[in-house]
Amino acid sequence: MGALASRQHAGVEEMDMPCNSLYRYPPKSGSYFGSHFIMGGEKFESSHPEGYLFGENSDLNFLGSRPVTFPYTAPSPQEPVKTLRSLINIRKDTLRLVRCTEELKTTGVEGSRPKVHYNVEFTFDTDARVAITMYYQATEEFQGGIPSYLPKSSNLQSDTVHFKRGVSQQFCFPSHTVDPSEWREEELTFDLDREVYPMVVHAVVEEGEEHLGHSHVLMATFEKHADGSFCVKPLKQKQVVDGVSYLLQEIYGIENKYNSQDSKVAEDELSDNSAECVVCLSDVRDTLILPCRHLCLCNACADTLRYQASNCPICRLPFRALLQIRAMRKVPGPHSPGGFSPIIAAPTSDSEEHTSEHVPPGYEVVSLLEALNGPLTPSPSAPPLRALGEARRPGGLPSYGSDIHLRMHSPLQHLCGGQALKLKKSISRSISQNSSVLQEDEMEKSFSEAEIQTPRKKTSQLAEENGVTPESENLTLSSSGAIDQSSCTGTPLSPTISSPEDPLSSSLAQSIMSMASSHSQQSQLSTDTVSSMSGSYTAGGMEEEEGGITPSPPAAASGSPSIEGELSPAESPEPHFVTVSAEEMDAEGNVTEEEFASPEEDDGQMTGRECDNNNAAGVTLRDVLDNVRGSEGCLADVCYSSIPGQQRSNPYHGSDNCISLQDDTQSHLSTKLV
């Protein structure tokens, strides 16, 4: 995307052109964009010439003025590809100037004002050893795809500080100070004509040949207050991977404020940042509006909005495209290894019936916000239930809360009059695109197991009449998600930080859905969150079937037709047991229907269980994908490449967009132009 003549017969490195001519916006001549663009493996015609889909056109000038060779070959539509790894992320909202405690007075002048110096502090995450250097009044140069920054003078840069891998690391260099008052007023801000950045934080990966040149760049400006003090303002962030520079853009509405440490967050602010679509207030939001980048719609409402309106419901600005982002998680088999390679799915169709056909084998669709932030609205009232079983996975198992796409109807209900917890005869089944669905053969096997257990129930009834409560009658059912300790890499989605070997690294939330049968069987599906990209818009929805019976999972591989879990009182509290007295059973040992309310009599939504998610409750917000325990909420970013698509049959220069996600994350992107 650029001048056609400059790309036909000349190599990228041999082009003779001014440094600030063709690849600046607006260009001095010709067009910056071509007539089409490629997203998610599908070609789209540009409906708005010279229109940047992901932000302001002026943002393109941060990508650099010279092209480089794009290092990736264009994959076939059916060929899986790896997502980009984002090993470093600087949380730009944490960047600040801290006034030094010791102020230097000007020598020889009495009564002069003390000279104020500042330290620079910020928080960052890294999945590898990293070297961080700060530059002031610096220009940017690319040599072999690796950026370098040259300050105006040698004293306008800090010493290089080395850090090991880790999450939520604090950069604080007391011996390095900066005094913005020494600079002219025009040097405090960024001027495109001068191409001088007031402040640059350059973090470079120092390990692994495969990560050579991998770096993260934070550019910032200074602002002077009325009292003479200064503050620093983040300008832009870039990620350099394999010699390609990607511009990071925020996605608004993807952060999780329920895990915020700030107790002063207003309730209405929390409600504004809930997971529900702002139009229907029921389905989970998964569609991004471009170019304003508000993630506020579900795919069904977005499909309707295309034909009824042309303005964003949040900012009321006209939009030109809708981008659906579907997160998927991998459901490994019983003998599958812990690590895996993420893939990007092929383009999907517009029909929801065909949505499941484009889900890669072994993956299932989950809520994007749940995948990034963990459970959004855990209920504080219901204690977590533990299922009976022989094997237990280490670590906590947070539930998905009461989200409409992810909730599982609880079969337990408290009854008045001092009666114990009783088991319902009819259990409603909720089927959605984010819930685990049992196959028909599993249903038949579960029903056959229930028939086998009928003589056992009669025996238990006789034993209960004699004052003995059989252990097999102590039943618990639970629906929970778990966070896998393994972590991987890559915003979009965003600049995310994680590592398959480091349990402390941040990653997209990896979850487990488990259901315990009425015979105390625990079936857990360990899953890893992945993400895929696809180039067509996919309308999604949710179907619910009330009054159905949720079958129990098939018996474990031990070979016994039923597993009778046994828990000691110290291991499981009494509220987790369900006792059915003999008087409440009929002659065949079944629970009588009069004692229990039908699903149609339930008013309101079932309350989700309280659980700990992978984000520590009580942490400040930040704008990265950090979902390791003890980490904070996150804000995903979208990456855009500065490299023209030479191998995409497009002769013009522009930014190749890319989604920077974790290695175990697949984000399904569907785009539909308006």
From Swiss-Prot:
Q: Where in the cell is it found?
A: Cytoplasm
Q: What is its main location?
A: cytoplasm
Q: Which UniProt keywords apply?
A: Cytoplasm, Metal-binding, Transferase, Ubl conjugation pathway, Zinc, Zinc-finger
> Mind telling me which InterPro entries this protein's record contains?
MGRN1/RNF157-like, Znf_RING, Znf_RING/FYVE/PHD
For bias kind Acidic residues, which ranges apply?
Answer: 583-604
Function statement: E3 ubiquitin ligase that ubiquitinates apbb1 for its degradation by the proteasome and thus prevents apoptosis and promotes survival of neurons. Has a dual role in neurons as it is also required for dendrite growth and maintenance for which its ligase activity is not critical. May act as a scaffold molecule to regulate this process. Acts as a downstream effector of the interconnected PI3K and MAPK signaling pathways and thus participates in the regulation of the cell cycle.
Protein name (Swiss-Prot/TrEMBL): E3 ubiquitin ligase Rnf157
Which species does the entry assign this protein to? Xenopus laevis (African clawed frog)
Q: What is the lineage of its organism?
A: Eukaryota, Metazoa, Chordata, Craniata, Vertebrata
